[in-house]
Amino acid sequence: MASVFPRLRKGAILTFDPATGVPIGTIMLQYNPETLTRSLQPQAVSEEPDRTEIFRLKGPPIETIKAEVEIDATDQLGAHVPDPVAVRLGIGPQLSQLELLVYPSSTVLLANEALSLAGTIEILPMESALTVFAWGAQRITPVRITELSITEEAFDPRLNPIRAKVSLGMRVLNVDDVGFITPAGSLYMAYQLAKEAMAAQAPGRGA
């Protein structure tokens, strides 16, 4: 599955079919964020472990990632031959791509409504795509979008946004969330193994 990831120097958000791992789409970050905030919450056995459990962990930490992303159509609009999509829609398509990460598909919504009207008693919650955050070759991990805040800062004469800042909040999905024998579980284990390999290169390791 790792072979589907582009060899690029920009961060990206990718989507896959959660069951098969088949790629669905790629959202390249136009500009890499200047900062990336990560938080890790250790999973202790209990809130107040006794002496026999003080060094035990239930599983991987709960890791969250926050990033501020800028999207700007200035270059496309100012080119010798302006981008026709940017001229017509500004950065609306890019914003819509990001927003749809937290939407169920309209096809599934309509299908569930049809089931409801047909009297189906139990309708399963709607499944979203597997979302993957790629930040360099060593940090490719499955995530769930927990926060998406958009500030539109400039508009064209048609009121299409042409510049915006997007605040992204993500929670890393680990094997406790998705299991081992799934595309997401395989990606998470590769992510942790890459972290362990990187830690082994630190000065003083094993000294």
PLM-predicted stretches and their roles:
Residues 1-207:
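Acidic, Ser/Thr- and Gly-enriched intrinsically disordered low-complexity segments
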